């Protein structure tokens, strides 16, 4: 149910009869009814042992564009976010943790995608012959928090997860 606020004098739109402050936050229950803020891009720096192979993978396989490039690093636009590959002499060891009966790389990054976009990427990766670390499947099927997920690895051994929720309200839900 969408709740509209026109200031603390109008309580008609709230099922709890909230008393909104000047920032559209309820004084009694603390619910924030303010309009969503524009999501800012996140930044992630990660190690690679071959910058040229990393550029080829992130541009050709994932469709990223490059930004600043130096001899020891390269900036990528990763689904609207900034990631930076840093050349290192040796890659760190990677550990896994069991999740839903599978060994999930403990260190990984990725993106939560729209349902249709996730399926398009899955189809592209399959068509391009990209090897999956964990192939596309639905984690927690028919449970709260159900999500489509898949893991791939870049040429330096960094794991990437791409996931999608049919019910996006479950992304940050603590009940599952």
Where do the protein language model's features map onto the residues?
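Short beta-strand/turn micro-motifs at beta-sheet edges
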Residues: 30-33, 94-99
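Core segments of cupin and vicinal oxygen chelate
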Residues: 46-92
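Vicinal oxygen chelate
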Residues: 4, 13-15, 30-35, 40-49, 77, 96-176
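N-terminal beta-strand motif that seeds the catalytic metal site of vicinal oxygen chelate
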Residues: 26-52, 108-109, 113, 164-176
């Amino acid at each position: 149910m969408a709740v509209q606020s026109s200031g603390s004098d109008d309580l008609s739109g709230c099922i709890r009869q909230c008393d909104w402050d000047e920032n559209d936050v309820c004084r009694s229950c603390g619910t924030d009814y303010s309009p969503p803020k524009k999501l800012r891009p996140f930044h992630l720096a990660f190690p690679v042992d071959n910058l040229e192979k990393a550029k080829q993978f992130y541009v050709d396989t994932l469709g990223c564009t490059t930004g600043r490039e130096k001899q020891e690093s390269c900036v990528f636009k990763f689904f609207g976010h900034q990631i930076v590959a840093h050349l290192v002499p040796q890659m760190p060891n990677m550990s896994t943790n069991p999740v839903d009966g599978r060994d999930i790389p403990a260190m990984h990054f990725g993106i939560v995608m729209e349902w249709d976009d996730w399926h398009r990427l899955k189809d592209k990766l399959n068509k391009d012959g990209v090897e999956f670390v964990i192939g596309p499947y639905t984690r927690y099927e028919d449970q709260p928090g159900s999500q489509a997920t898949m893991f791939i690895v870049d040429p330096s051994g960094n794991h990437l997860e791409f996931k999608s929720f049919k019910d996006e309200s479950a992304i940050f839900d603590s009940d599952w």
